[in-house]
Amino acid sequence: RSNKNCEFKTIRKIIYNQKNIAIEIQSQNIETNKIDYKETLNPKLPKGISNNKNIIALIDTGVNYTLPQLHKNIAFQNKKLLGYDFWDNDNFPFDQDPRNNPFYPRHHGTTVFSVLSREAPKSTIAIYRFPALNMCKFKELIEHIAKNSIRIVNLSMGSSNINDWLCFQEAALKNNKIIFVVSAGNNGFDIDKNPIYPASLKLDNIITVTSSDLNGRVGRGSNIGNISIDFMLPAERVEVIDHRGVKAFTGGTSYAAPRLTAMISRLITANPGISNEDILKILKKRSIKSNKKVTKYGWIPDPLDNYLFN
């Protein structure tokens, strides 16, 4: 990284192991030649005990599972972390997306996890790193979720290329008892006219959500669509824990989705045998219909309230 005079200020390098797998990013001070900062990639997994709590599956860029404040909500099975890294094909679904810049990887999943853990505290979360390099692995990913009897999935991502999501669509249709809560996207347009996938897929077990402010107005840049988008929730200023373990505020449809996922998870915890159809009925009763053609069912202003759950 250089300054405006093209003078180097920082050097970053990626360290690989003998199997040619990236294990660490090091930041070197150009003046002292000392390593100022190290970012571990795929660190050791935490130890945990198996639990039978209501499980949410989080499909994202991974999670920083080393953060102590997240451990109580990480799902374990046979004392091993429940989930998988379908990007790297290993058991370390650590939060990183190196596609734009491998020296400064993007992080996203940890913040989403933190919303789920705070708003569905009695649930545990299985961590899945999505298969960015081969999107047809979504078939295998969803089968893994189904095999572990997980009923609800949070998916805060999408793209405009339907070909990326054909295998996902096939697997989601086959496993139609699983509810997929999907973010509508932050492109600032109507996804009925400009589809974003998987949000725009016509599947009964996909619930698409967009973001609002506290007064029910569409969030800045949040997509709309009274056919493709089911609900709108306040998510323009959401407290999160980022991949460093630091509290911060963020917003957008990526965080409206986990708010609705957490709400559904609490509903399932209170009513373990509830059907997908009855879940949708309760969500519709909780929503306020707007005259504006923004969503199909309306705005849920109070996703932390358990009204109608018992």
Which residues fall in each region the model found?
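Active-site core segment of subtilase-fold serine proteases
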Residues: 39-123, 140-152, 215, 290-291
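Protease zymogen maturation seam
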Residues: 1-55, 68-69, 298, 303-310
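Hydrophobic/aromatic beta-strand patches that form the interior of the parallel beta-sheet core
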Residues: 57-59, 84, 126-128, 181, ...
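Short Gly/Pro-enriched turn/cap motifs at secondary-structure boundaries
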Residues: 46-47, 103-104, 187, 219-223, ...
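Glycine-rich, phosphate-binding/catalytic loops in enzymes
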Residues: 68, 72-79, 169-172, 197-200, ...
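Substrate-binding/access-modulating region of protease and related hydrolase catalytic domains
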Residues: 107, 111, 119, 123, ...
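Extracellular S/T/G-rich loop segment that most often corresponds to the catalytic His/Ser-adjacent loop
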Residues: 60, 196-269, 273
